[in-house]
């Protein structure tokens, strides 16, 4: 049960990482420019989300003994 819960947490944060990367890609194209006048701040927020999610994934991997 513990392993399933940890794998679910890892999957959740892997999805958050992917979401942040997609958002950054959108900001790199004209679609996102009109909505966010401060693109640097918007991208920085996505990088912060990505890094937090990555740390969570790495933490779960460490707990499970699956460090990659």
Can you describe what each PLM-predicted range is?
Residues 1-68:
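Extended, charge-rich alpha-helical interface modules
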């Amino acid at each position: 049960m513990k392993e399933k819960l940890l794998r679910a947490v890892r999957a959740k944060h892997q999805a958050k990482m992917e979401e942040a990367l997609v958002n950054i890609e959108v900001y790199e194209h004209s679609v996102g420019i009109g909505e966010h006048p401060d693109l640097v701040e918007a991208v920085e927020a996505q990088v912060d989300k990505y890094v937090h999610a990555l740390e969570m994934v790495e933490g779960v991997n460490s707990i499970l003994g699956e460090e990659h």
